[in-house]
């Protein structure tokens, strides 16, 4: 897991308050907006994947935020997308992928594929002036979509007398019923950034932890630092505007039948076994598509 330097909260606060906005009209570093704060999160989740059954994983994510906008993303995803955005990078990525496939075909060791497959296709950007989030994600085999949502989709209930400490910050509890799941989050007014992991935002402080009631999805901050890192646009241009529910239904079909789909698309070179009956108890972050 990537670890980030913990710094004094007064320095973080100063950096957040003193932010000066800039526009971003190209991918050049000097033209992109800069973050005030960088928060690393671990996303722990359980899901059902064909014949693999219940899979439990941890994936690192990063939130880059200032008072105007933010981006939540998986760093390995952004790295691969950046490679694929140039001819030389695409050649490098293809070489890595082909080598991993050859090793898998020879040894049938699925672990060799971990370094060359996407562990997430998720990006979430937020525009605080418009109070709108934009979610980019996979929508099936080779399909990628995006959609916009108003911040008002999330209706928070703050529980002032319920507190806990996360990364040394005093946090207050809030809860919401959001798109089929009940969530509990912990936010700290000590860091006046109304943002957090995934789509979560709109509370009077940074959200450091978020968990849904079944224990299948859990975001936990594991590092905070003042940062002037550039908030780059998303490299992948293959995302098409889609409806949120359509994206989730398409992805559900792919996940439920992924082994047979992958086998067919690779001419049988990759065969992870037969698909298995679907267990709907383990599902996506949002379940209201069913």
Give the label of every model feature segment:
Residues 182-184, 193-229:
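Structured soluble/peripheral alpha/beta segments that form catalytic or ligand/cofactor-binding pockets
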Residues 46, 175-177, 211:
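A generic structural motif
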Residues 145-189, 194-196:
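Extended beta-strand-rich segments in extracellular/periplasmic secretory proteins, especially
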Residues 1-34:
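Bacterial Sec-dependent N-terminal signal peptides
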Residues 89-92, 183-185, 189-191, 201-203, ...:
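Short, charged/polar low-complexity linear motifs in solvent-exposed/disordered segments
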Residues 35-40, 167-174, 202-209:
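Short, hydrophobic/aromatic-rich segments at coil-to-beta transitions
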Residues 25-155, 161-163, 170, 215-290:
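Extracellular or lumenal secretory-pathway regions
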């Amino acid at each position: 897991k990537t670890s980030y330097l913990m710094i004094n909260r007064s320095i973080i606060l100063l950096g957040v308050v003193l932010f000066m906005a800039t526009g971003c009209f190209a991918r050049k570093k000097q033209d992109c907006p800069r973050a005030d704060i960088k928060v690393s999160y671990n996303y722990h989740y359980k899901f059902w994947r064909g014949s693999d059954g219940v899979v439990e994983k941890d994936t690192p994510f990063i939130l880059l935020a200032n008072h105007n906008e933010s981006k939540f993303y998986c760093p390995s995803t952004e790295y691969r997308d950046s490679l694929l955005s140039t001819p030389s990078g695409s050649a490098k990525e293809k070489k890595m992928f082909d080598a991993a496939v050859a090793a898998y075909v020879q040894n049938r060791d699925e672990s060799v594929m971990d370094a060359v497959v996407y562990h997430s296709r998720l990006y979430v950007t937020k525009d605080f002036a418009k109070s709108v989030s934009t979610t980019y994600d996979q929508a099936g085999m080779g399909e990628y979509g995006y959609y916009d949502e108003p911040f008002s989709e999330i209706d928070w209930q703050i529980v002032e007398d319920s507190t806990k400490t996360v990364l040394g910050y005093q946090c207050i509890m809030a809860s919401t019923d959001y798109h089929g799941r009940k969530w509990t989050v912990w936010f700290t007014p000590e860091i006046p950034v109304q943002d957090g992991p995934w789509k979560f935002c709109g509370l009077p402080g940074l959200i450091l932890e978020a968990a849904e009631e079944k224990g299948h999805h859990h975001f936990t901050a594991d590092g905070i630092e003042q940062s002037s890192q550039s908030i780059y646009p998303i490299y992948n241009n293959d995302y098409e505007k889609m409806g949120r529910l359509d994206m989730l239904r398409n992805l559900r079909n792919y996940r439920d039948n992924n082994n047979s789909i992958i086998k067919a698309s690779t001419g049988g070179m990759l065969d992870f076994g037969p698909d298995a009956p679907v267990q709907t108890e383990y599902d996506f972050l949002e379940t209201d598509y069913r």
